[in-house]
Curated annotation (Swiss-Prot):
<keyword id="KW-0067">ATP-binding</keyword>
<keyword id="KW-0411">Iron-sulfur</keyword>
<feature type="binding site">
    <location>
        <begin position="8"/>
        <end position="15"/>
    </location>
    <ligand>
        <name>ATP</name>
    </ligand>
</feature>
<keyword id="KW-0479">Metal-binding</keyword>
<dbReference type="InterPro" id="IPR027417">
    <property type="entry name" value="P-loop_NTPase"/>
</dbReference>
<keyword id="KW-0535">Nitrogen fixation</keyword>
<keyword id="KW-0547">Nucleotide-binding</keyword>
<dbReference type="InterPro" id="IPR000392">
    <property type="entry name" value="NifH/frxC"/>
</dbReference>
<dbReference type="Pfam" id="PF00142">
    <property type="entry name" value="Fer4_NifH"/>
</dbReference>
<comment type="similarity">
    <text>Belongs to the NifH/BchL/ChlL family.</text>
</comment>
<dbReference type="GO" id="GO:0046872">
    <property type="term" value="F:metal ion binding"/>
</dbReference>
<keyword id="KW-0408">Iron</keyword>
<comment type="subunit">
    <text>Homodimer.</text>
</comment>
<feature type="modified residue" description="ADP-ribosylarginine; by dinitrogenase reductase ADP-ribosyltransferase">
    <location>
        <position position="97"/>
    </location>
</feature>
<keyword id="KW-0013">ADP-ribosylation</keyword>
<dbReference type="GO" id="GO:0016163">
    <property type="term" value="F:nitrogenase activity"/>
</dbReference>
<keyword id="KW-0560">Oxidoreductase</keyword>
Amino acid sequence: MRKIAIYGKGGIGKSTTTQNTVAGLAEMGKRVMVVGCDPKADSTRLLLGGLSQRTVLDTLREEGEDVDLDDIVSPGFANTLCTESGGPEPGVGCAGRGIITSINLLEQLGAFKEEKKLDYTFYDVLGDVVCGGFAMPIREGKAQEIYIVVSGEMMAMYAANNICKGIVKYADAGGVRLGGLICNSRKVDNEDKLILALAERLGTQMIHFVPRDNQVQRAELMRKTVIEFSPEHPQADEYRALANKIDQNQMFVVPKPLSIEELEKLLVDHGIMN
C-alpha cells in the first residue's frame, strides 16, 4: 500500500485536487482510502455525494471508546473509503492533536490491515505545516510520499517551500520523500514556467499542471468530482492524467528548500515581473 499525504497552502484546492485524483485512481480499479486531516471535514464530501460525514473526534466524543470501524469509515465513489478526523470544538484544544488521535484509532481498528487490500491511503492535510500535529503524517512515517499543491502565487510557493523544510526535518526519521508539485492553476502569468523552475530548484518535478476550469466548480455545486459529474469533459482527463502520473511515479526526493531571497528572485526571474 502506498501512503500519500497532500499538503499546500490553505485555500489552494488541496481537497478538490485530492478527491478528483482519488476518483481517477478508483476509476483505474485502485482501492483507495481518504483520510481527511482538516477540522473543516470537507476532504471527502465530493466522493460521498455531499453527505456530511460524522468525524472521528465527534464519534469519540459521543460514543466514548466503544467505536467500530464502520462508525467512522464510509464507502464513497467507485469503492473508495472515506474518513474525516475532524477537530476540537472551536476555541478548545488542538486540531493537530486530533489528527494524531484519529490516525492512531484507525490503526487500532485495523483500517490499514492487509486484508483491506488497499492500494493507496491519501492524507489530505490542512494548510501549511503549522504545528507538530499537522506534520504528524510526515513525522511518524504515516505517509511515505508527499505531493504539494501549489500555484504561481507568492504565498502558495512560500507555503510549498516551508512544507519542504518539514520534509527535510523528518526525512531521516520517518523515511518520507517528496513526490512532486501539483500546480493547481490560478492563471498567473508564466505560471507553468514558474512552477517548473521552482520544482527544479527544489530538486523535484512538477508532476502535473491542472488548468483552471469552471467545470470544477459546477461539479462541486452538484457535490461530485469532475470525473463523476462529467466524465467526458477535458478537465476530467486532466485529473485522470494526474492520477496516472502519481500511479507511475518513481521520483522521490529529499527536497532542497530555498531561502526567502532565492524564492523572491525566482518570482522576479520567471514570474509576473516579466
